C-alpha cells in the first residue's frame, strides 16, 4: 500500500504531507453542464425563474464551494485560494438546451486546485438544479471533468477533446 500516498503504513487513510513541496502558481479548470427543458431555458435567459437570478446565485455558490472544498473532501488540504472564476455558456441544438459551466481556480501554493475547481463546477450545477426543479425535475447534470491544470511537479495536463 505504500505506493498510495493517501494511506499510512497500517493501510489507513491519511492527509498527505506536502511540507516539502515547492510553492508554485497552480491553476485548474473544470467543466460540467446542466441540460434543461425549453421552458427552463427560456425562463433562465429572461430572468423569470421564481427563485431569482439563477446564474448569479450559482456563481456565488460556486465560489463559496471552491473555498469550502477541504470541508467536503476529507483528504483535501485547506488552501488559500487566489482566484475563482465561474463562466456560463449556452449550447443549443434544437430542443436540447445545455448550460456549460466552467470553473477556474488559482492559487500559489504547494498543492493543486483540481478538487476546488471540480467542486465549484459541481455546486454551480447543483444550484441551477435546485433553483429550477419546480419547473422540471428531469434536468441532467454532467459530465463533470477536469479540463486543464498547470503548476506543480506533475506539470501541465490538458484533457484530450473528443
Swiss-Prot record:
It catalyses: (8S)-3',8-cyclo-7,8-dihydroguanosine 5'-triphosphate = cyclic pyranopterin phosphate + diphosphate. Pathway: Cofactor biosynthesis; molybdopterin biosynthesis. GO terms for molecular function: cyclic pyranopterin monophosphate synthase activity. Substrate binds at residues 75-77, 115-116. The active site is at residue 130. Catalyzes the conversion of (8S)-3',8-cyclo-7,8-dihydroguanosine 5'-triphosphate to cyclic pyranopterin monophosphate (cPMP). This is Cyclic pyranopterin monophosphate synthase.
